[in-house]
């Protein structure tokens, strides 16, 4: 299991922020990535559809003393921002919640400045059998789960839109009980 500190440290190293970036985390939940990169960028906007999540992240950001953070209630499939607004767009464990993941992907592409960085951190199915198993488990623990995308589906999303600079797939072993406990699954 990869700890929060391990993946946020990895994210910070990967984005190579210069300190002047306007950043956005889409479908942010408690904006784990956004809060982690906040010290390294000019500002971070956390967007989520769920007001309860935004209230949680506001409290967390205040506790952590993060000043350069803002919160927006909005739909990832129709982002409430002008074209080419952000230098860095991040989404973590979100695309598997969308029936049509290309919609939020296109929106993230639209609001990203030319030459900007898009970071997608999500589960990837390496085989159809693994996808079916993972989807069954994810659906039990999270009823908003739709399906895990395959590597080929991710590649198709990026194919025409971006120059891929870093692609990394890491096998992260997860204890089933601790994974289910995250959402209080019986």
Regions found by a protein language model. Name each.
Residues 146-161:
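Short alpha-helix
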Residues 119-142:
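Conserved class I S-adenosyl-L-methionine
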Residues 77-88:
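A short acidic, Gly/Pro-enriched loop at the edge of an enzyme's catalytic core
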Residues 102-114:
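A short glycine-rich, Lys/Arg-flanked "PGG" loop and its adjoining helix->strand segment in the class I
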Residues 165-186:
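C-terminal helical/coil "lid" or tail adjacent to the Rossmann-like core of SAM-dependent
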Residues 87-100:
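A short SAM/SAH-binding and catalytic strip from SAM-dependent methyltransferases
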Residues 24-26, 30-78:
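Class I SAM-dependent methyltransferase SAM/SAH-binding core
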Residues 2-21:
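Conserved alpha-helix/loop element of class I SAM-dependent methyltransferases that forms part
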